[in-house]
Amino acid sequence: MDKLLDRFFNYVSFDTQSKANVKHVPSTDGQMKLARALQQEMIELGFERVSLSEHGCVMGTLPGNVAWSVPAIGFISHLDTSPDFTGKHVNPQIVESYRGGDIALGIGDEVLSPVMFPILHQMLGQTLITTDGKTLLGADDKAGIAEILTAMVRLQQRNIPHGDIRVAFTPDEEVGKGARFFDVAQFNAEWAYTVDGGGVGELECENFNAASVTVKIVGNNVHPGSAKGVMVNALSLATRIQQALPADETPETTADYQGFYHLSSLKGSVERAEMHYILRDFEREGFEARKRRMFEVAKQVGKGLPRDCYIEVTIEDSYYNMREQVAEHPHVIALAQQAMRDCDIEPVMKPIRGGTDGAQLSFRGLPCPNLFTGGYNYHCKHEFVSLEGMEQAVAVIMRIAALTAERAK
């Protein structure tokens, strides 16, 4: 395996869960610890120009081994795991030659069931890596990191012709800041691929337009016994805002190209409340309409409030759909498709119901579609990855590098 699984297990041992609403990058110390470890590993593996920025971005170059000119390409994965579920003390389980049925996650009652996750029916006979039911796994995106570095090692060991290959590992992707301090000029690639996708064959070149919304509500608290005409309950206003949004446009009611409003947190009291939403839409027109609706709903709910009570809405764009940017460079997609077919994998073109660092980088002049990792059920205790899928990802990365050199000859 050329240490593919060993690498993965090592990386998931680092607690790199990122945090939202933190001003500095990386948002957690664990990410920088993993970044330093990767920096050292890349140096030991023979990478050149290995660097680690103050913001936790690791970069390095695997030098080419051919005499002719080949475009420099890149591969990128992220260091952090989702804030949605703990990534501390990850204890991976190996299920060899999966035979079907429920997989016990650790000692308790948690199971990974094909009833809830039918994709397991396609995993028969494969080696699966699961959690112990207490944490997420971290295949998103430490499988990607392990796959990229393993592919680079195998290119060297097998003396496969390739040009310069840039590799980068970024912080805080899960909170939308992964590419904020990414130095595109220093990376110096013609195009790149994030290795941050899901099931085998996935190739993604379009993603959500995304924004985060903060709704701050200031009410007025008095004794409930004498509250008539005086009390303004901030929590009641919050529920009215949520009820005014379409109930059939939430994450749990949408799929494919449908967008949504997602209330991710609500905290508060009678006096004050704060709501956090994320807005998602594949089309820019729909995206802007969702933002306008948030302001309109807040204005309507807040109509007639006393002077000292108010509703304040702040919206910050996170990233945009990279579809048009990548479409200007069709060879980038065609190359990945051919590489997959050369590895006996049929490409599955699908939209990302989320975002990647590649979305932001594509808008900054680095076309960057997304490749699969072989992982499933991200951001939760039911996350798992197929070892065979990871091996296929390694093969595709290697084939992309080789094809790039072949076509430049």
From Swiss-Prot:
Main location: cytoplasm
GO annotation, cellular component aspect: cytosol
Binding site for Zn(2+) 2: D140, E174, H379
Gene Ontology annotations of biological process type: peptide catabolic process; proteolysis
InterPro entries listed in its UniProt record: ArgE/DapE_CS, Bact_exopeptidase_dim_dom, Peptidase_M20, Peptidase_M20_dimer, Peptidase_M20B
Alphabetized GO MF terms: metallopeptidase activity; tripeptide aminopeptidase activity; zinc ion binding
Pfam families from the UniProt entry: M20_dimer (PF07687), Peptidase_M20 (PF01546)
Domain of life assignment: Bacteria
Catalytic residues as annotated in Swiss-Prot or TrEMBL: D80, E173
Cofactor: Zn(2+)
EC number, as in UniProt: 3.4.11.4
Keyword terms: Aminopeptidase, Cytoplasm, Hydrolase, Metal-binding, Metalloprotease, Protease, Zinc
Catalytic activity line of the entry: Release of the N-terminal residue from a tripeptide
Free-text remark on how the cofactor is bound: Binds 2 Zn(2+) ions per subunit.
Binding site for Zn(2+) 1: H78, D140, D196
Functional note: Cleaves the N-terminal amino acid of tripeptides.
The protein, known as: Peptidase T
Native organism: Serratia proteamaculans (strain 568)
